[in-house]
Amino acid sequence: SGSMDGDRIVMAQKAVIALAEALEPTQVKLSVKGFKTKGLPRSWEKDYRKSRVKKPCSSLSPILIFNYKDFGQPLHRCREVIGGMRKSFRNVGGYHNIDGASIALMGEELMKRPEKRKVLMVLSDGLPEDTGMNKRQMNADLVDRVLGLEARGVEVFGVGIQTDAVKQFYRWHTVVNDTSDLEKELVDRMSNVLIGGAWDARKAS
């Protein structure tokens, strides 16, 4: 989203690189994606607002998915791409984040993987948002999507970047407020989970 610009996108970059470095020597296959909305044609929003019967939906805007790292791709081959995360978010598309539909897409990709254990970590700096959409409906959609993935065996973790909004949506969550929190709150805990350990609920923010 637009609010991820500045310090928050830098923190996300550092978090991704630190986690990838921690997992590089292991057998864990890591993929890194980003998502935001593509610009919404005004005619679409006008038609939606004018419609007498507003059918429930999770989004109006098309979703852009950025591929920063593929499963099994060595970090040295994609470090530059991850470093360009801020530029890609600034130069392409709109400014909103449709979390529910986006993590559902990532979940479908995970379900195609051969690994028995499937973990989805979501970095977020706030609430789902899209042009013309009901915020309560979008929040409820995200909760439903998370529960749906968990029901299919996917472990879903929320990482709040300078926000505790993740508490509303993710059973397993933590908050990173500054770069000093990265190693303690994210890298150590998530790398432990990904190599087969358990989530330390006592430390969850």
Feature-to-residue mapping (PLM):
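Acidic, glycine-rich A-domain
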Residues: 1-205
